Amino acid sequence: LDYCIARMAEKLGKKEIADEFYKRSQNYRNVYNPATSFMQPRDDKGEFQKDFKADAYTPHICESNGWQYFWSVQHDIDGLIGLTGGKERFAQKLDSMFTFHPSADDQLPLFSTGMIGQYAHGNEPSHHVIYLYNAVDQPWKTQEYVAKVMNELYLNSPAGLCGNEDCGQMSAWYVFS
């Protein structure tokens, strides 16, 4: 949201406001823990939470987990790539997202449906992640996963969507894909 405010302020010629919100739009860097390579909650002393598990669904992350919310820097993909150590490391992390499957003991929330590894297509915060392979010059992986989702998670039946339609987002993803 901060980045959007900055862009609007810039278009309106409000440089001071734009600069403030561009700076705020980089705050995601403050919760990136290089030791775990995830965005991670901090405690009241500013230290990263010690018992953090990226695949856990906790009160610190709304309707998702650390794997799914890591990629929520849509306004600065190049910055996120840089945080992870470059395109090769970023692509490896993407690969892990799609291959690190929940265990049989994991109690997934109701909204975590359409799972491919930690990617939850049934919950909208993941929808853009498949396309991030394009940013690291591996478009064939985007194409492979998009085809998989379209062919396996959208069915010609009353239960045709694998998740919550949320104002048409599931259908819109399909149409745009």
Language model regions located:
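Active-site core of glycosidic bond-cleaving carbohydrate-active enzymes
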Residues: L1-S177
